[in-house]
Amino acid sequence: MSVTVKRIIDNTVIVPKLPANEDPVEYPADYFRKSKEIPLYINTTKSLSDLRGYVYQGLKSGNVSIIHVNSYLYGALKDIRGKLDKDWSSFGINIGKAGDTIGIFDLVSLKALDGVLPDGVSDASRTSADDKWLPLYLLGLYRVGRTQMPEYRKKLMDGLTNQCKMINEQFEPLVPEGRDIFDVWGNDSNYTKIVAAVDMFFHMFKKHECASFRYGTIVSRFKDCAALATFGHLCKITGMSTEDVTTWILNREVADEMVQMMLPGQEIDKADSYMPYLIDFGLSSKSPYSSVKNPAFHFWGQLTALLLRSTRARNARQPDDIEYTSLTTAGLLYAYAVGSSADLAQQFCVGDNKYTPDDSTGGLTTNAPPQGRDVVEWLGWFEDQNRKPTPDMMQYAKRAVMSLQGLREKTIGKYAKSEFDK
């Protein structure tokens, strides 16, 4: 229901609105309500031998066609099979029954790609032995192409080279250092669907002899789901259950985003679901789980984790245009509560030698913070502090960030350092 605002001087009524300049999020379950297949368009008119040469020579010359890449990957990977030891289904689609032998492309629906196939340069010296490492190389370039940081890019490329050399000792990189022809491959929906299908298949068959192909595809899993990853990281760093962590959400914006992420029926907690690949399979163009669509949750969660000494949180991206003050206070209070209490309890005993706490003694002294992690107790205490961080809270935060060095701009680490280490 719209809220009206009245001008005092003349009682003019207005309804304040902002322009709708953002696309709404799209959920994977909604995709499958409209369609029961994921189409993959491949040109299958050329032989695997021809395609192998086209791709090899195209990579070396810097003029490879993504259509050739996709067609080659399909031809080289279509006979890889795995036997299911349980039924496999997702969003109402039956992928296979226990005992079935299935392939990578059973996860999608193959369609013929219309149009003229681009010309390619043949190479008769290429053999089927290349099919053991060339798909790994092509899929690995997807991961390399997703980062623009030179140092990390080189590290990934070196790792890819080592993976290929484990299969073929004579392997030499086909793409010269500094050439970025493969960076745009991620814009091709058929290529990303192959990447997603490969990763989803080998996630199910982790012990498959070709599972090393996941070196490049693993970043497809939970792509654009950074806020969801933040939630998982926060649960681990605090040692608290998902339910208990949720009770510590103290800001309306964070609560709204939590509701958005936890929409039922999306198979978030189903490991063999299509859901982790919602972006690369084309199930969603705007992920409900990204840091872009959940900036307040992402900031609050990563700041809390950082104040609990998480090394991973220091490089998390700092969102723009959020209500920093309240979110910072909420993150500080949560981290202080966890950091100043130890969730310790005897887990095993010999005979009946068990510790029994005496609940009749103790109790809070004036201004003393609670001893546990109950959000209700902490909020009551915080009210007594006039809802402002205490000097001890600020000192706790300073100790957490004072040793941080080499922080990148626009990161949570950089923000926390400037906020608390004054």
UniProtKB/Swiss-Prot annotation:
* Record InterPro entries: Rhabdo_ncapsid (IPR000448), Rhabdovirus_ncapsid_C (IPR023331), Rhabdovirus_ncapsid_N (IPR023330), Rhabdovirus_nucleoprotein-like (IPR035961)
Sites where the protein binds RNA: 143, 152, 206, 214, 286, 317, 408
Domain of life of the source: Viruses
Establish whether keyword Membrane is in the entry.
no
Ranges for the region named Interaction with the phosphoprotein are 350-390
Tell me which family the UniProt entry assigns to this protein: Belongs to the vesiculovirus nucleocapsid protein family.
Its subunit composition reads: Homomultimerizes to form the nucleocapsid. Binds to viral genomic RNA; this interaction contributes to the virion assembly. N in the nucleocapsid interacts (via C-terminus) with the P protein (via C-terminus); this interaction allows to package the L polymerase in the virion and positions the polymerase on the template, since P acts as a bridge between N and L. N(0) interacts with the P protein; this interaction prevents the uncontrolled aggregation of N(0). Interacts with the matrix protein (inner layer); this interaction contributes to the virion assembly. Interacts with the L polymerase.
Functionally, this protein is described as follows:
Encapsidates the genome in a ratio of one N per nine ribonucleotides, protecting it from nucleases. The encapsidated genomic RNA is termed the NC and serves as template for transcription and replication. The nucleocapsid is bullet-shaped with the tip containing 8 turns of a conical spiral before reaching the helical cylindrical trunk. Nucleocapsid assembly is concomitant with replication, therefore viral replication depends on the intracellular concentration of free N, termed N(0). All replicative products are resistant to nucleases.
Give the protein's recorded name: Nucleoprotein
> Lineage of the native species?
Viruses, Riboviria, Orthornavirae, Negarnaviricota, Haploviricotina
Q: What gene is behind this protein?
A: N
